[in-house]
Amino acid sequence: DENVFVDARDGNSYPIITIADQVWMGENLRYMPSVSGPGTLSDTDPKYYVYGYDGTDVAVAKALDYYSTYGVLYNWPAAVNACPSGWHIATDAEWTQLTNFAGGENAAGGKLKETGTVHWQAPNNGATDEYGFSALPTGFLKDNGTFMYVGQYGYWWTGTESGGNNT
């Protein structure tokens, strides 16, 4: 199917969506060659995390609902190597182009996020998922090793360098 990408590294498949002239994966990446607990932070070594999991067994982590629904949380060294061949982390300019196409900063969030309250906390007002991007509230791993905000907020890396240490 031309609207599905299969990652040859692990067999995970992802819907492909086109918004304006940009091509995006329609789900969060699930590539995870290893897994770390939230207390195992690093600015230099790749670390892969599954929200709420505090272990190192990849098979156990992949069996969790969070993994199959929300994907993997990556620190920066993992994020830069997680993309399959032919894909890249969107730059700040690409995110800005997407945001502008979706109506600007005040409107884009609703147009790009999943509708309903299965994954987003109620009331999730304004969510239309107009383009099939289906953004999910993955939360993040704070730089003190605390998982935060699943169900409330979604965060994505940009390929454009800036400060910050959260995953």
Regions inferred by a protein language model and the residue ranges of each:
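Conserved positions within compact, well-structured domain cores
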Residues: D1-T167
